[in-house]
Amino acid sequence: MKITRLHTYRVAPRWMFLKIETDEGISGWGEPVIEGRARTVEAAVHEFGETLIGKDPARINDLWQTMYRSNFYRGGAILMSAIAGIDQALWDIKGKALGVPVYELLGGRVRDRMKVYSWVGGDRPADIVQDMQRLLEGGIDTFKLNGCEEMALLDSPRAVDAAVAKVAAVRDALDMRVDFGLDFHGRVAAPMAKPLLRALEPLRPLFVEEPVLAEQAEHYPRLAASTSIPLAAGERMYSRFEFKRVLEEGGLAILQPDLSHAGGITECHKIAAMAEAYDVAFAPHCPLGPVALAACLQVDFVAHNAVLQEQSMGIHYNRGAELLDYVINKDDFRIDAGFIRALPKPGLGVEVDEERIVHASRNPPDWRNPVWRHADGSVAEW
């Protein structure tokens, strides 16, 4: 079998699908994208594609290493996201060719179902309780919401109190019927992270995500020592080499690599195994589309330390399309009592509606994240 062609499709809301075709008529799908930089990743995918044409798609490890190591400059969000989507599509091809789900190729399932959670509240959390109550009625009892809005390097105690008040309102309304993680989203700098974490402790969040930016990872051990809340990070780390450093230094209880940003299934399967050796949980980041989610689930079902899976149904970014709008086998993605079962179809387990994808790609979105500013006019972390 040989790779013959790569197609990319940018579609609403902010996703990009990749189709890799072969000379035997088997095609694989991936989801390589950086939210807000889709066109840049698209260029990288096609640049890698020039070296993939004519190659055997079954040699996934060799193709991965070739894409990663054959260029002097490597890594980073753009290149690793391009590799990630290609890698997903290659695993999809191999599973389809052999007639088995990818998790069978990775050694088989260690669990029967996977716990999932939903995003609520938007960039500036609002209507949180109503959103949670609606989803709770549908069987989802675990959530994530942004833990704060802009926060200056040194901010007023009032900013801490305002953030805590929003979270307290959720706990007061729903008590312990729900679990929720809080995403600081890199908005909080080290001087403010410690008092904010301390103030949130009585509300018993499941975890705090990106308590500080990944480039400030040296603060993770210090922050972990100051709080009982499990700390999580990883969506802005792109290879096992970056995760190696945070595992060695400690501080994180949960790793959250994104399988569309951190090298795909091949790389994130290794990251999960590394985390297990340090008694650290694995909870892939995935506010993206159905192919990305399907790729995450393949690793979730073989990684013993996988604890939670993010999924984007109803997320505030989904304007123009919902998670399953481009999926034919929607029933396979059904969530029951907060869990999803292993996808049974060969490959990644997602049957995409190619006709709808092609049609949607004729009017591609150009999504950009907003630029926020502090009260003094300086740029704030979004």
Curated annotation (Swiss-Prot):
Protein role: Catalyzes the dehydration of D-galactonate to 2-keto-3-deoxy-D-galactonate.
> What is the name of the protein in this document?
D-galactonate dehydratase
EC number(s) given by UniProt: 4.2.1.6
Keywords assigned by UniProt, alphabetized: Lyase, Magnesium, Metal-binding
InterPro entries assigned to the protein according to its UniProt record, in alphabetical order? DgoD-like (IPR034593), Enolase-like_C_sf (IPR036849), Enolase-like_N (IPR029017), Enolase_C-like (IPR029065), Galactonate_deHydtase (IPR023592), Mandel_Rmase/mucon_lact_enz_CS (IPR018110), Mandelate_racemase_C (IPR013342), Mandelate_racemase_N_dom (IPR013341)
Q: What GO molecular functions are on record for this protein?
A: galactonate dehydratase activity; magnesium ion binding
Record-listed Mg(2+) binding positions: D183, E209, E235
Q: Does the keyword Lyase apply?
A: yes
Cofactor note as given: Binds 1 Mg(2+) ion per subunit.
Site residues, Increases basicity of active site His = D258
Q: Which cofactor does it need?
A: Mg(2+)
Q: Which SUPFAM superfamilies match?
A: Enolase C-terminal domain-like, Enolase N-terminal domain-like
Family membership noted in the UniProt record: Belongs to the mandelate racemase/muconate lactonizing enzyme family. GalD subfamily.
Q: From which organism does this entry originate?
A: Variovorax paradoxus (strain S110)
Q: Any extra remark in the record?
A: Reaction proceeds via an anti dehydration.
The source's superkingdom equals: Bacteria
Listed under GO biological process in this entry are:
amino acid catabolic process; D-galactonate catabolic process
